[in-house]
Amino acid sequence: MSEKTSSLKLIPVMLAFFAMGFVDLVGIASNYLKADLGLSDSEANIFPSLVFFWFLIFSVPTGMLMNRIGRKKTVLLSLIVTFLSLMIPIFDDAYMVMLISFSLLGIGNALMQTSLNPLLSNIVSGDKLASSLTFGQFVKAIASFLAPYIAMWGATQAIPSMELGWRVLFPVYMVIAVIAILLLGATTIHETKEEGRPSTFGECL
């Protein structure tokens, strides 16, 4: 694989790393939801906890799924789940609706964290893999860094918010998720075959 081809294949993968950073919007969203819905501390703290809960539940099954359907398809699935999680709050911000949204965001993040690094290893290898992983984490950090500012700009009407206020954060990141889905879906990535049969859930435990 030529260096130019590898660089082009990295674009959708780095967009996926950016999408991985969407999960950090839960923290700032919890603060706004607490004020908007008049939630108690315990009710608001459930939102960030959901992310870790679903990662705990889905991390092992995702590894098994990835062995069966492949790394690229698993990352695509994670992006689709993330897209759905970002679309839901555009229409409503009721407490149960946001619980569902953040649950999907946590599930998508669990799928992505388990499969994205292995997918990257099929594009670059050796010394370049380490630097690419580092750059991916940098891209992820950009998404985490921007989330509170986009929410703040929406809340203060500093940017067009489509009457969503701070929730303009969701359609902005949703568009990026759609771009990542389309680009990754159109990118051909040769995946190395896993030797042996796929592990069962019992064997993983």
Task: Annotate the PLM regions.
Residues 101-138:
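Cytoplasmic helix-loop-helix junction between adjacent transmembrane helices
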Residues 185-204:
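Flexible cytoplasmic inter-helical loops of multi-pass small-molecule transporters
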Residues 8-41, 117:
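Extracytoplasmic
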Residues 85-89, 105, 184:
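MFS-fold secondary transporters
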Residues 24, 52-60, 145:
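Residue-level signature of mid-helix packing/kink "hotspots" within the transmembrane helices
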